[in-house]
Amino acid sequence: MKSERVNYPVKLLNFILSIMNSYLFVLIVSIGFAESSSPKSSTSCSLMTSCAVEKCLDRGMVGRIITESSRDEVFGNLVEKFDMVCIAAKCGNECSQCKHCHYALEQMSALAQGEKTSGLCPKLETCVFNCLTEDVSKVLSCVATRCNVHCYDGDCPSCKMISRRIFSNICKQHSMTTQPQIKYEGTCPNLFMELADDYVAMKKKKL
């Protein structure tokens, strides 16, 4: 990743942060996972996950995505609704107690200001940084088409773990495994892993 700082005007920084709220979830929840194995951290992150699903994902919208999306589309349609800005605003206490959520906000700020991040998820971080430096006005579509996949392709296991927790919570609430277009006999976490692999394969075909 480039180490030099890129200076953006303040208004542009605010614009960057506002439009990156959903797609950068896959990056910013991923940092600090190495410290998240303690019981206290795990419990705190579970509270953050529950809060995120309750306050930052409209239940009706999620239900429509699950019932109206094809099996091939449901995963992407869901994970692209994960909103870190909302989590920071509405689940601030829970986020501050979850190390990789709290630290993630600092990483998002660093990215938006063109500063070097921790480098724990090299492909994902480099991809987002490149989207910012290439054309900030198109950063949303750039991150969606080029970077989102790195949360699930093995580059960033911590990102995949957090996404799996949120997905599994939603899956259980909405009985996803029994949906006619899904028809999955296993558990929600296993469904996540299968759909994530399919998502990566589909994304790579489009690149």
From Swiss-Prot:
Q: Kindly list the places in or outside the cell where this protein is found, as annotated in its UniProt entry.
A: Membrane
Q: How does it sit in the membrane?
A: Single-pass membrane protein
What are the GO BP annotations of this UniProt entry? defense response to Gram-negative bacterium
Q: What superkingdom heads the lineage?
A: Eukaryota
Chief place of localization: membrane
Q: Which UniProt keywords apply?
A: Membrane, Transmembrane, Transmembrane helix
- Entry GO terms, CC: membrane
List where the protein spans the membrane.
Answer: 13-33
Pfam families, A to Z:
DUF5332 (PF17266)
Q: Which residues form a coiled coil?
A: none
Cited function: Acts downstream of daf-16/foxo to suppress tumors induced by disruption of gld-1. Potentially a direct target of daf-15/foxo.
Q: Output this protein's name.
A: Protein dct-5
